[in-house]
Structures are given as C-alpha cells and as structure tokens.
C-alpha cells in the first residue's frame, strides 16, 4: 500500500511540533490543529513533494459524540483527531499524493464549522470546498466564490449532516403519484403522501445562475444543461467578447441523487449497485474499485481466489475499451468525423454483447462481489473474447490511419486545451488527462489490485498535454488493454472449471453473510482507489464495525477533471468548447453523484 511512513515525515514533525502522525493498517494520517493547517499543507506540497491533490471532505461526528460507547470504539482505533475535543462536530481530511515517491498521506483536523480555504494551494480544493459547504455547511474563510456545488442556492439544508433524514424533509405539497390528469384516479397498492421534499422553482434556478456568473463581457452564452455536445446534463455559462471566451462558469447538480447519503444506509454489498450508476459507461470498473476497497478494509483482498482476480481484471479492461470506444465515436462525431462514430460503435456493440453474455447486463452490471465475482464465466466466453481481441487491433489501426494524421483533425486538436504538469497537479486531474500531460500516474501500476501486478502493460503518456495528446493516450490505452486481456485469458484457460471464484472465509459463511444479513466490517478507515477510464475513482470509507459504513466519500475523477475546464476555455473560441470538453471526457452521473 503506497502510504507514507512516520519516518518519511520526520522533517515535517520537526518543522511543526504540534503535528503528530498516526499509522494504521490502511492509512497514514498527519494530525494538525486547525490554525496551522494551511502551513502544513503548503509544507507537504512544496517541501515534501505531495503536489497532487486527491480529495477533501469532512466526517460528521455527531452520532459518535452522542454515543460514548461508539465514540470510544473509534478512538481506540485512532480514527479521531484530538478525541479530547468534544465541541468540534466535524473532522476534516485532505488526501495528497507524492507521484515521484508513490506515497499517499491524509491530513486531518477538527472544526465546528469553519476552515481556511486551500484554493491558493490547489484549485481542485476550491471545488471540494464548495461540495463540503453544500453538503455539510462548512464555511471556508477566504474562499473566492463559496456557492453550492449541487443543490440550488436557496436550498436551506445540508443533506450529508447526520441529523438530515435519508428521505429528506417533507415540506412541499405536490400531487400524489396515484393521481392522473385525465381519466380515473388510480387505485394503487400504495397511497403516496402528497407532502414531498423541496423542489427548486424557476426563481430558485435564476438565483443560482446569477450567483455563478461573474460577468466581465457583453454577451453570455448558455450551453446546456440539455445540449447534445455536453453528452449529459451539464450547464456551462460562457462570458463572451465576440466569439472569444473571457470566462466560463459550470453549474452542476442536475443529476445529483445523494449517493454518499445512501451509502450510509445500505449494507456494503447493497451499495454496489449505486456504483453502477455513477460512471454508467464503465460500471464494471466502478464495481471493482468499490469491492477492492471493502476487501482491503476487511483484510481479505489477498485471500480472493486468483480466478476471481483475473476475471475482474479482464472484465474491467473490456469495459475500459468499451468506454474509450464511446468516447472516440462521440468525440469524432462532435468534430465532424461521422465515419469513425459508426466504426467505433460497431466494435463497442461487440463488447456489449460479450459483457451481457457473461454478466447478464449491458450497462448497470454489478458483476463483482466483495470476495470475488457473482458467478463463473459461462462456457465459451473465453473463445468469444479471444476472437474479439484478435480482430480489434486491425480495426483500431484503420481508424488511426483515418484520424491521426488527418489535417482537419490536427487543426482541431493540436495545441488546443494544453494542460501543463503544474496545472495537472494544481487542478487534481487524473487518468488520461494527467497522463496526456506527461505524468505517468496510473493506479494499476502505483497501487496494483486484483491481477494488475501479475500482468505486463505500459503506461502511455503525452508530451505537451493538448487535446491531441489525450486522444493518442486513449488510443494507446486500448492497445494496452488488449495486452492485459490476452494475458488474463491465457491464465484463465489454464484454470480448472472447479477452481473457486469467491473467497468463502471461515466456515464458508462469508458469501451467505454478505448476501443475507450483511457482513460487519471491522472498525477502521481506508482510502482505496481504482483506475477508471476517466481517472482515479477513490473511496474513503469510515467503519464503526457495523454492516453499513459510517461515512463514504467518493473521489470522482470526472468531477476534478472537469474543474480545469474553465481554465482551458479562457481566451479560446466557442468552436473549441466541444473539443476541450470531449478531451476531458466527463460523465455527469459521476460528477453529480
């Protein structure tokens, strides 16, 4: 596990005697008072090389502070910073990464509702702080524009606080779902209550729009939230001088479903289906990242049978190609290359058929399980996969012939949307976006999971970080995915049909426990991540020993990759808006959660 050790942080401890280091099985934390938080974060970034910002949020300790037994249980495991402080309701955490040394660290502090902003250290932190303000009501001193991230600005509540009910607060009367406009009212089995949670009005949305917009020019162009070029319910406001974009504002939340709130009320295996519905274009990869996180929390990841690990790795790489094919087809279509769209979707349909034949589903799949996979590969599955990976490289080569040296393609992509290495760290981008900037950051190599430490593959990187580099990186990633799948198929062909595909545990009761009453994960915390087609999908999980997590913070790669978009659009033309957005490749189900 790539966690920093206390010995790696001695220089920090000498510079800040008030700080302390806590090493746990699945994390290393630096505990600091709030008044030196910014100084410690700056020291970690500038002196110790922790330049990549991964995530920031808070944990609401209200339920623990009100339950002495539960509180002492987590204090015993060193999960709480400054446990003697019973007044500060929230524990804030910041997750940073040192790419050069491949080490990760968490910085923790306590607060009762106010924190200093980190926006001058990392722009990505600015978006993370908006989310914390939106969900928990945390106020950030010095924040340039502290507005809500997902909810509309007149919404009066903070949904991720422990005292906010899962079903919301019913305060608005709306027609019952049993009532119809025409014909007889339905005599349904359920009599739905007319009182519902608050919904935004047009006036609420106008207030939200005005709070986002910092008008600097004469023309404002609305792009979205329902535009074919955004490929999802994303809303952009462009401030224009002629066709030149002076500044860009992003309004998210149209697809916000409260996934992290739901996680606190579902058992660990039950939450698996919600990971399908975040990045719905790469559900298998999201499933895999979640089950690996919980396996590591439970201490059973090394006990998962090799067959299950190779199956999960193979299926995730098929899903990666699937996702990149959809990206390539729609990207080319947006720029006028209709032929590539047709070719890419023809091959993607073959992968969809393979996935459906193995798992029974095409989009929302939930095939992996904590401890393995739901079922073994059906007979003939490997033969179909071998047939696909034998022909696919030839198809990919033909597309490269059409696109890679095409003069129009070059003009639309070369030196457009350049992301330097410094900007990549500053904005917390990951996946093909950071690799396009020449930084070889790939979780499959840096923190291998499942069978990734058993297979050989390369990490493609770009040179200058423009849209063209990001295109080349994704094309090469599909080739590397084929390499990985070939090795997985070769291993699986040698395995007996009777080899286990699920870790049974003591007394062979784990699977029954997980699918039935739910397994109890031990008291602890973990940050674990997987390499999704869009970047690092991370899960920060706090467990108090129950069948459901106390807190789940999801690090969505699309959310942080998208935060660099306004920077890339400055002084560009409207025609570049689609190109740059498509090169980032966000999925709105993941940004909004």
UniProtKB/Swiss-Prot annotation:
It is a peripheral membrane protein. It comes from the Bacteria. Transmembrane segments: none annotated. Its EC number is 7.1.1.-. It is found in: Cell inner membrane. NCBIfam families: NuoD, PRK06075.1. NDH-1 shuttles electrons from NADH, via FMN and iron-sulfur (Fe-S) centers, to quinones in the respiratory chain. The immediate electron acceptor for the enzyme in this species is believed to be ubiquinone. Couples the redox reaction to proton translocation (for every two electrons transferred, four hydrogen ions are translocated across the cytoplasmic membrane), and thus conserves the redox energy in a proton gradient. NDH-1 is composed of 13 different subunits. Subunits NuoB, CD, E, F, and G constitute the peripheral sector of the complex. This is NADH-quinone oxidoreductase subunit C/D 1.
């Amino acid at each position: 596990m790539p966690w920093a050790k206390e010995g790696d942080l001695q220089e920090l401890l000498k510079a800040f005697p008030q700080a302390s280091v806590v090493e746990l099985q699945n994390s290393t934390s630096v505990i600091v008072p709030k008044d030196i938080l910014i100084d410690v974060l700056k020291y970690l970034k500038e002196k110790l090389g922790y330049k990549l910002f991964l995530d920031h949020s808070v944990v609401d300790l209200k339920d623990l502070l009100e339950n002495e037994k539960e509180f002492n249980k987590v204090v015993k495991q060193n999960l709480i910073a400054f446990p003697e402080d019973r007044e500060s309701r929230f524990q804030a955490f910041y997750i940073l990464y040192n790419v050069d040394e491949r080490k990760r660290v968490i910085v923790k502090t306590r607060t009762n509702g106010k924190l200093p902003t980190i926006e001058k250290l990392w722009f990505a932190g600015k978006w993370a702080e908006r989310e914390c303000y939106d969900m928990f009501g945390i106020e950030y001193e010095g924040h340039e524009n502290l507005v809500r991230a997902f909810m509309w600005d007149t919404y009066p509540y903070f949904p991720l606080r422990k005292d906010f009910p899962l079903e919301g607060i019913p305060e608005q009367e709306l027609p019952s779902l049993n009532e119809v406009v025409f014909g007889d009212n339905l005599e349904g089995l359920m009599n739905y209550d007319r009182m519902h949670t608050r919904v935004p009005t047009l006036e609420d949305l106008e207030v939200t729009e005005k709070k986002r917009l910092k008008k600097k020019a004469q023309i404002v162009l609305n792009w979205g939230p329902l535009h074919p070029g955004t490929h999802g319910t994303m809303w952009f406001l462009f401030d224009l001088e002629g066709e030149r974009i002076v500044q860009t504002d992003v309004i998210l939340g149209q697809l916000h479903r409260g996934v992290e709130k739901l996680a606190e009320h579902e058992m660990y295996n039950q939450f698996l289906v919600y990971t399908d519905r975040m990045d719905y274009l790469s559900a298998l990869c999201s499933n895999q990242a979640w089950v690996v996180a919980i396996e590591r929390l439970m201490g059973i990841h090394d006990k998962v049978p090799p067959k299950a690990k190779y199956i999960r790795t193979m299926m995730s790489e098929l899903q990666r190609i699937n996702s990149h094919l959809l990206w390539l087809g729609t990207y080319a279509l947006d720029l006028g290359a209709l032929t590539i769209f047709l070719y890419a979707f023809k091959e993607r349909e073959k992968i969809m058929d393979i996935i459906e034949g193995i798992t029974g589903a095409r989009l929302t799949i939930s095939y992996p399980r904590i401890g393995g996979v739901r079922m073994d590969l059906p007979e003939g599955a490997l033969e179909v996969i071998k047939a696909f990976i034998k022909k696919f490289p030839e198809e990919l080569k033909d597309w490269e012939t059409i696109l890679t040296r095409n003069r129009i393609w070059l003009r639309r992509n070369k030196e457009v949307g350049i992301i330097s290495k410094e900007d990549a760290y500053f904005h917390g981008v990951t996946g093909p976006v950071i690799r396009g900037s020449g930084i070889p950051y790939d979780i499959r190599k840096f923190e291998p999971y499942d069978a990734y430490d058993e297979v050989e593959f390369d990490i493609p990187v770009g040179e200058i970080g423009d849209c063209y580099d990001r295109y080349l990186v994704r094309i090469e990633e599909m080739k590397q995915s084929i390499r990985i799948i070939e090795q997985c198929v070769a291993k699986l062909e040698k395995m007996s049909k009777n080899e286990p595909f699920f870790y049974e545990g003591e007394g062979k009761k784990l699977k029954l426990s997980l699918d039935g009453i739910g397994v109890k994960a031990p008291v602890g915390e973990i940050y674990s991540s997987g390499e999704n087609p869009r970047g690092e999908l991370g899960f920060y999980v706090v467990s108090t020993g129950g069948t459901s997590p106390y807190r789940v913070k999801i690090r969505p790669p699309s959310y942080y990759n998208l935060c660099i978009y306004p920077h890339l659009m400055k002084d560009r033309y409207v025609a570049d808006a689609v190109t740059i957005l498509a090169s980032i490749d966000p999925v709105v189900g993941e940004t909004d959660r």
